[in-house]
Each structure stands twice: as structure tokens, then as C-alpha cells.
Amino acid sequence: MIKQYWTKQRIWLLIFLMVVGIGALLFTSHNEQFYQQPIAKVISKKTMSKQRVKDQFDNVDHQYNQQLQVKLMNGKYRGQKLTVQNTYSDSQPMDQRYRVGNEVFLTQLRKQGGKLTANVNGYKRDTVIVFLLWLVVLMLLLLMGRSGMFAFLSVVINALLFIIAIEIDLKQNGQHIMLLFSVLAIIFTFISLLLVLGFSKRMLATFAATVIGTFVALGVSMLVFMWTHERGIYYESMEYVTQVPRPLFLAETLLGSLGAVMDESSDIIATLFELKQLNPAVTRKQLFISGRNVGKSIMGPLINVLFLIFMVDTFTGSLLYIKNGNSWGYTYAMNMSLGTIQSLISGIGIVLSVPLVSLFGALLLGKKVQR
């Protein structure tokens, strides 16, 4: 079994990926000269002071003043050393603690009176990001082979399309954001399924169920919004929004629920396809019932996972609200309600996609009963 898995092609692929990974890590560890922003390496640190702070809500924290000696890694002052100050706290909400060996970005680097001065502006993280990306590609290609390659390719293409869509939205100042991201959702679905499943009946059934289930769920939610006059929905709680928040929230919900619906539809279709392979004479009714039963099994866990994903995004903000004397009700309304609404809309899409994908799968894969 092990010999069958580790073929000559896989061994050469592993060697190639290891060489690429080591090369990429070495490059990102020594690429400071390609950055315009000054980069320095911490060569020594010293804690100068420690202060206990307390706010009006009796929250206690400690602030530290670090004195860092750093060595410049790029620019016209490369190789020179300077001393910078850094203030951080135990909670580290908006600050960071630096250690010897860290590479950091500097701002406001200048020479005054023959002495260099600057401010610290965060870690240089490209090595960590490249390592994680390489690890994902390594596992995809080694464990999934060609399917993993196409899955990664679909992610890259979708990411590029997403960036293009954001640029278009910024140029239009959000005037057609729902139309833009609705078209993008359809393209996302088509490209992802085409690359992963290929152009087949499985792909068509999954595509139809995903698109219909997602948009029907969004349509149902918009009807509910209209009937309730959107009472209890606090769009003003969305952070850093420079456009009209309502369509932006709906576009965000559309893309968020799309992945879950596509995941469920793909699982059901894969099961129906296996049943068809095992029993070519299986009828459409049998496939429909089987698909519905599979959907019932995975529907609950998938909704819960989606709910947790939406909620965990608000966890730290909720703690901050409560620690600053706000009630649970106000914290939920201003920090968690939109995530709950997104979870409910996605749940509607997940529920609707079960009969839809079972129906499409049965029609395309099943055998018509002869009368």
C-alpha cells in the first residue's frame, strides 16, 4: 500500500516542493532590499518601566516601555544601529511586544543631530505567510494530487476575481454592489465546480442547486426584512464602512453563505454519484430519497459550524463591550446581531439546497422507471 502511494512521480513532486519551499523561505528571510519601507532587526531589548493602569470600569492592565536596539537591514542607512522606543500592554489590543531576532518595519526614519531616530510599525511577516502557503500547497498536491492542484487553482482565480470586483466597486462607489457581487458569486461557483468536478452532470447539478439555494435564501431574507421593516438590524455596528452599509451587508452575506451551500451540495452529489456507480440501475426516486437523507445528516453540523465561524469573528469585540460596562443585550445588538442574521440566512440556504440538489442529482443521474 505504501509503495503504491509513493510512486516515482510523487517522490519527484515532493523533492520539487521541498526545494521550492526552502528557496521561498530563504528568499523571504533575506529580501529586505526589495522593500521601500525601512526594515530593522531587533538585536537587544530592555524593559525600562512598568505601569499599572486602571479604567473607570475597574479593568486592570499593565503597560511596559521597551527600549529596543535595532540594526537596519535595507536603505541608505543599512547596517547602522539605532535605539527605538516601544510601549505595549499585557492585553496587547493595539500594540505588540518585540523580542530579540524579530524583524520589524520602521516609520519616520530620519537623522537628527547625527543620530538616527524612528518608530516601530509592526512585524515583518512575509516569511510566516509564505511558509503557511507552501504548507497548504504541499498537503494539497501530495494528499489530493491533481484534484488538489485544481482546488488550489480555483482559489487563486477566485481571489484575483475578488480583487478585481473590489476595485470595480471602489470606482463605482458601491452603486451596483449587489449586482456586482451576485454575478461574482455565480462566477465563483462555476469556476470552482468546473475545476474541481469537471464539466459533468455532477457539476451541473451542484451548480444549479448552489446558485438557486443561495439566491432563494437571500430573497427570503429580503422579504423578511421588508415585512419587519428591518427592526433590530443595526447596520451602524459595521466597522470601517465608507459605503451604504445595507447592500454591503447583503453582499457579504451572499458570499458567506455561498461556500456553505456549495460544500453541502458537493457532498450530496458525490454520494449520489457513488450510489450510481455501485448500482447503475438505481432509480430517480431512490436517488432523491438518498440525497435527502444525506442532507439531513450533514445539515445540522454544517449550520452549527457556520454559526460558530460567524460568531467567533465577534468574540473579542464582545468581550471588549462587556468589559467596558455594556449590558449583554446592548453587546449582542451592536456586536453580534449581524453575525446571527448571516448565520440564519446561510442556514436557510443550506436547508433549501438539500431538496434542490437531491432533485437535480436524481434527474441527471437516475434511471427513469419503465412503465
Description of each model-found segment:
Residues 1-39:
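Hydrophobic secretory-pathway targeting helix
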Residues 39-99:
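Membrane-cytosol interface segments
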Residues 90-127:
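Extended, hydrophilic extramembrane loops/domains of integral membrane proteins
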Residues 134-138, 146-256:
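Transmembrane alpha-helical segments that form the functional core of multipass membrane systems
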Residues 200, 275-285:
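Juxtamembrane helix-boundary/capping and inter-helix hinge elements in multi-pass membrane proteins
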Residues 257-275:
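Short helical (or helix-break) motifs at transmembrane helix termini and adjacent helical loops
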Residues 282-303:
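Membrane-interface alpha-helices at helix entry/exit sites of multi-pass transporters
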Residues 293, 297-300, 308-371:
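Hydrophobic alpha-helical transmembrane segments of membrane transport and translocation systems
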